């Protein structure tokens, strides 16, 4: 099954198991306000959009999803022929791992001018990255400033570990949440104290 055991009762096939008519299925889906799943799962269950129209779709790790993989959701229509999803919120970090693409940079390069005119220069780029590149190029415009924002509080890295990526990639804007594992002296493994990387890490 596709989730942790405590949540398996909430899988859609289990939620709908007791329904005996289409009307019951429709009513149960209509009552549910939040649906969680992968892009691939939702793209393969297009019948869902005939039963329910969604106000917003939040796509996490959007920088690791190529545009064709999102196409089914972007184009989803309800029974009235309107957009089945009213708005998309893409969450990701274009400075971390990109989508996995086997082709080389030159093989995935886009040469058509009509595609380049909308910011599509390489097929390995995610929709997130293309849109971010477009709006950040016009960052002085009051309109485009409303399209994106940056989450500045991180709860993952120890404050010492975070110093380098914070300065090198995020302009010093990252702030630690202050969780227990982020605090305290960073203890290096035996043998690393004299390592050049360790010296750089400690000195910075």
Q: Which residues does each predicted region cover?
A:
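Conserved helicase NTPase catalytic core signature
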Residues: 1-55, 69
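Conserved helicase motor core of SF1/SF2 NTP-dependent helicases
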Residues: 26, 40-42, 48-204
């Amino acid at each position: 099954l596709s989730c942790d055991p405590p949540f398996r009762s909430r899988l859609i096939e289990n939620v709908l198991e007791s329904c005996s008519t289409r009307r019951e299925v429709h009513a149960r889906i209509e009552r549910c306000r939040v649906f969680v799943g992968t892009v691939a799962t939702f793209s393969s269950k297009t019948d869902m959009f005939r039963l329910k129209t969604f106000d917003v779709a939040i796509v996490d790790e959007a920088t690791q999803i190529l545009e064709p993989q999102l196409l089914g959701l972007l184009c989803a229509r309800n029974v009235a022929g309107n957009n089945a999803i009213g708005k998309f919120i893409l969450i990701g970090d274009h400075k971390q791992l990109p989508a996995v693409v086997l082709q080389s940079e030159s093989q995935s390069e886009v040469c058509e001018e009509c595609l380049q005119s909308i910011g599509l220069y390489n097929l390995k780029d995610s929709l997130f990255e293309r849109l971010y590149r477009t709006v950040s190029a016009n960052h002085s415009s009051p309109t485009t400033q409303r399209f994106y924002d940056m989450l500045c509080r991180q709860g993952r890295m120890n404050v010492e570990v975070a110093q380098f990526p914070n300065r090198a990639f995020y302009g010093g804007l990252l702030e630690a949440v202050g969780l227990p594992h982020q605090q305290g002296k960073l203890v290096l493994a035996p043998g690393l104290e004299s390592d050049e990387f360790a010296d750089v890490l400690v000195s910075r």
